[in-house]
Amino acid sequence: MQRQVVFATSEMYPFSKSGGLGDVLGALPLALHRMGVPTAVVTPFYGRLRTADYPIRLTVSDCHVGYPWAPITCDVFEADYHGMPVYFIHRGEYFDRRYYYNDHKGDYFDNCERFVFFCRALLALMRRLGQPPAVLHAHDWQTALVPAFLYFLRQTDPFWQDTRSVLTIHNLAFQGRFASRLFETSGLPPQAWSVDGAEFWGDFNLLKAGIAYADKVTTVSPSYAREILGPAYGSGLDGILRKRAHALHGILNGADYDIWSPGNDRFLPCRYTPTDLAGKAQCKRALIEELGLDPHLARRPILGFIGRLRGQKGIDLLLDILPRLMESDVGVIILGEGNLTHEARALELMEAYRGRVCTIVSYTEDLAHRIQAGSDIFLMPSRYEPCGLTQMYALRYGTPPVATAVGGLRDTIVPWPSPESTGFTFGRCESAAFLRAILDAVHLWTTAPGDWQGMVRRAMAQAFTWERAGRAYLDLYAQLGVSPGEEGA
């Protein structure tokens, strides 16, 4: 039996998704699978799991999850996703809920217990299936204990001796930080409770444990990997990251162009390509009509924002400068939800500038596609951005971004006025700098249509493929001395 790369994740599109993590885990494992790498994914069986297109079946009943004090069981379901197995850990008391991590009252009180259980259940499933993986690849705090458990299991259990671990950090700000008493019930050995392990200012930090014990740690862009080594972006974990700097790598995410490409997008009223951009103008007119914007905006630039309405995404900067933008006779579309104060303010501005500003406080996948296609300029004023996917989508849709020069935004956008420019960036994350960059973009759109069309075509030619990212991860696995696909013992 060939040894697999097994991905541990709390989300995987199309089965579950709350943000970019789901997109990544719907694409990267599949890219490796298509490259001939034996690959599997393990994820929770949520109450609102989307399985209509991929029927699931019970594959393991009463899988025993070993805890020091008592056995707990779970059922495991399986789906065939384009020939790749996806396993779903089912235990109703933990995962049969409307949302993944929180509701309107806040984070679920038992999140630590839920995801400690998931990590232990994944390891129990591998045992039950009888074949140790070549690589266990965990993602974010929810699965960060997989590398930690593996580190200690390798010391006592020959089954795991040749398995290596990778932890990918998609956003360092979300760490899974809990009360210290929950460490005692996690099943980690006492020696893991240290400043070089799971302990963080007296709390139990799941992400820190994963960073400490994973064989390799990755982030989702080279720039972000450098940024998190310092206090400005390190979210308190820059110390442990510097200690593990030799094991830290930045690998840029890819974009799923099977889904996000204007040449084959089923959500668009008209498709288009770099050699035939007429469809983009038609998408713009259709979007103006759909959202009830003033028809004259077909002859003016439309600025699109898609993202969570939270401080990290810089939505407050956009709201601050929006009245000033109205003086330039542009349209603004905001799609997203998040902080209630930002939501209310965005809706108030829509009322104040009705016909020129449209705020949709929700997220729908189909409308996101149409905004990418129908906008002229995409706004991404993130205070930090580990990688970012929406700017990659904007580039492919010929919608040059205006973005902060941080993290993955720095790695994916060539800024104006370079002859190879694909967008606009600004250095200081503040309203004045953001406004200047937008006005530069509006000026180019208005006064130099030939230069603008050149930028649009260069943007659409960018290719941040998952195959490229997959090859980088295979190189990383090779550094660990493992070759997925080799026959196991």
UniProtKB/Swiss-Prot annotation:
It comes from the Bacteria. The keyword Transferase applies. It is an enzyme of class 2 (transferase). Pathway: Glycan biosynthesis; glycogen biosynthesis. ADP-alpha-D-glucose binds at residue 17. Disulfide bonds: none annotated. Its EC number is 2.4.1.21. Keywords: Glycogen biosynthesis, Glycosyltransferase, Transferase. The keyword Glycosyltransferase applies. GO terms for biological process: glycogen biosynthetic process. InterPro entries: Glyco_trans_1, GS/SS, Starch_synth_cat_dom. Pfam families: Glyco_transf_5, Glycos_transf_1. Synthesizes alpha-1,4-glucan chains using ADP-glucose. PANTHER family: ALPHA AMYLASE DOMAIN-CONTAINING PROTEIN, GRANULE-BOUND STARCH SYNTHASE 1, CHLOROPLASTIC/AMYLOPLASTIC. Belongs to the glycosyltransferase 1 family. Bacterial/plant glycogen synthase subfamily. NCBIfam families: glgA, PRK00654.1-2. This is Glycogen synthase.
